[in-house]
Amino acid sequence: MQCPFCQHTDSRVLESRSAEAGQSVRRRRECLQCNRRFTTYERIEFVPITVIKRNQDRELFDRSKLLKGVATACEKTGLTALQLESLVDDVEAELQQQAVREVTSTELGESVLTKLQSLSEVAYVRFASVYRQFRGIRDFVEALDQLKESGDGPLPSVLDEPYEDTAQPTIMISPQ
């Protein structure tokens, strides 16, 4: 390792420890030429993952973009930021474990949907509506039917019953 002070190429390691939750190694070094000490970090270099979009454009996988999309779908569902981070961590880990360095946006979206299904049915339907580009109520009904058939989570029994509008109209009269 080259010394940042004198550019000598030989140094000795004084101390090594795990850093960044085990994602890197912190090493304290001493230059054999000038005897000054410096710190280095050793990290795993991940090969970037490319996402192939629907229009065949390619862009680098962006964790923050995925997290933002998932967070939007999960607004007001009671899911914590930690749960969302964990979901995105799982998706990213699956991508890193694949031998192929390209993934289609379809595969990425389906991976997210699979994980959302067990966390929140509302978030699942919201994410699916954007990802699958729902065009009408029929698309929502089909997504709900898929959830119901999968049996992965407890769907409210209200979905088994036909919808009846029992709300009474409210008439407001304002004094003049």
UniProtKB/Swiss-Prot annotation:
Keywords: ATP-binding, DNA-binding, Metal-binding, Nucleotide-binding, Repressor, Transcription, Transcription regulation, Zinc, Zinc-finger. Residues 49-139 form the ATP-cone domain. Its cofactor is Zn(2+). A zinc finger (unnamed) spans 3-34. The keyword Zinc-finger applies. GO terms for molecular function: ATP binding; DNA binding; zinc ion binding. GO terms for biological process: negative regulation of DNA-templated transcription. Residues 167-176 have a biased composition (Polar residues). Residues 151-176 are annotated as: Disordered. It holds the Pfam family ATP-cone. Binds 1 zinc ion. It comes from the Bacteria. InterPro entries: ATP-cone_dom, NrdR-like_N, RNR_NrdR-like. Negatively regulates transcription of bacterial ribonucleotide reductase nrd genes and operons by binding to NrdR-boxes. Belongs to the NrdR family. This is Transcriptional repressor NrdR. It comes from Acaryochloris marina (strain MBIC 11017). The lineage of its organism: Bacteria, Bacillati, Cyanobacteriota, Cyanophyceae, Acaryochloridales.
